[in-house]
Amino acid sequence: MRVLILGSGVIGVTSAWYLAQAGCEVTVVDRQPAAALETSYANAGQLSFGYTSPWAAPGVPGKAVKWLFEQHAPLSIRPTRDLRQLAWLSQMLRNCTAERYAVNKARMVRMSDYSRDCLNALRAETGIEFEGRQLGTTQLFRTQQQLDAAAQDIEVLAQYGVPYELLSPAQIAQFEPGLAGGGAQMAGALRLPEDQTGDCRLFTQRLAELATQAGVTFRYGQQIERLEHAGGQITGVQIDGRIETADRYVLALGSYSADVLLSLGLHLPVYPLKGYSLTIPIVDAQRAPTSTVLDESYKIALTRFDDRIRVGGMAEVAGFDMSLNPRRRATLEMVVNDLFPGGGDLAQAEFWTGLRPATPDGTPVVGATPYANLFLNTGHGTLGWTMACGSGRYLADLMQGRTPEIDTEGLDVFRYLSPRSVRPHREAA
């Protein structure tokens, strides 16, 4: 079976790897000169198998109003003329109930938990190195209210058998001794010992090398222009003015997936959530994080690589704007100075931004479509690195006609489609 994958971020490359392992003839096409040069380039670096939660949560609408007036708000909304932004925000608000939050979080934990097992198996099989650590995540709560609100998340963790530990303020420094040098006061913490860390770009580029050795063809620097279709099938992809064909097609274009699908009559509610990161050279390892520390107040993660600290987070709903906002850099610097002062050289930090492809319910879109030979793997939001291996393996099983190892409920695009829109779009005569 010949498979054409559109997109060479971590989602596209893991899809290629697992499809190649299943015996498919795989080609990956991307506009960039190498893999992982967009959203996968400098994300927060956390493999948050336990800390997997949708942004759409009870209380978020009220918090969003308050955040409008805060200098270091984790979420900001900049209205655009794109009606899809309004539609996406409306759908997100409808998912901010306790009932929907529980359903969405359970779906996300299902995929994340599976992805941990897939990544561990991949590491054992290939020995792939990506500055990874397996030392857990420590989620910091600055207030008792935050600690109390974590009860619902803990209930879902217990339901899925995800190990966790509640830490008192005195216990936190046992796992992250560098925090002792900061002046921040904490009410407590939630520790997730099975979470991991690693450089997503390194992982993706090294897996692309392994995939190439396994027979996958990567074609970089090529523009994906449109999908051609007829009779409920994709008949080809226009790439740099030429029509390329395959037996099956995988769309893994992140935030740009929705635009490509419009010509097919499919309205995919995937919208870019703009995030920021700083990559900071370590100057004092004793004052740097040991693994990943997540600051619940600012929704910012601080992750340890070999000789660097990656500080990432925040979400701007601002369309496809890729400009670097100095106010966001100030927030990242404020948090790292508060928690790990003196650990890294901020003057030498690399400031970066990327667009996370987010669904309004937080769950990715992985699986079949109304077009028989078109499959999607997108919409992972802030958790693409976390869910990449699980999503790639899950998709490969579906495309091969094998029963996936996890429940398929609620993971594909059909949860968003009305009965009318399930019928393939007909091209104008």
From Swiss-Prot:
Chain positions recorded as FAD binding sites: 3-17
Class in the EC hierarchy, top level: oxidoreductase
Any one of the GO BP annotations: D-alanine catabolic process
Transmembrane regions: none
Function comment: Oxidative deamination of D-amino acids.
Annotated signal sequence range: none
Family membership: Belongs to the DadA oxidoreductase family.
Protein name per its UniProtKB record: D-amino acid dehydrogenase
InterPro entries referenced in this protein's UniProt entry, alphabetically: DadA, FAD-dep_OxRdtase, FAD/NAD-bd_sf
Swiss-Prot/TrEMBL cofactor(s): FAD
Keywords for this protein: FAD, Flavoprotein, Oxidoreductase
Species assigned in the record: Xanthomonas axonopodis pv. citri (strain 306)
Catalyzed reaction equations: a D-alpha-amino acid + A + H2O = a 2-oxocarboxylate + AH2 + NH4(+)
Upper classification of the organism: Bacteria, Pseudomonadati, Pseudomonadota, Gammaproteobacteria, Lysobacterales
A GO CC term attached to the entry: cytoplasm
EC number assigned by the record: 1.4.99.-
NCBIfam families (UniProt xref): PRK00711.1
Single GO MF annotation: D-amino-acid dehydrogenase activity
Domain of life: Bacteria
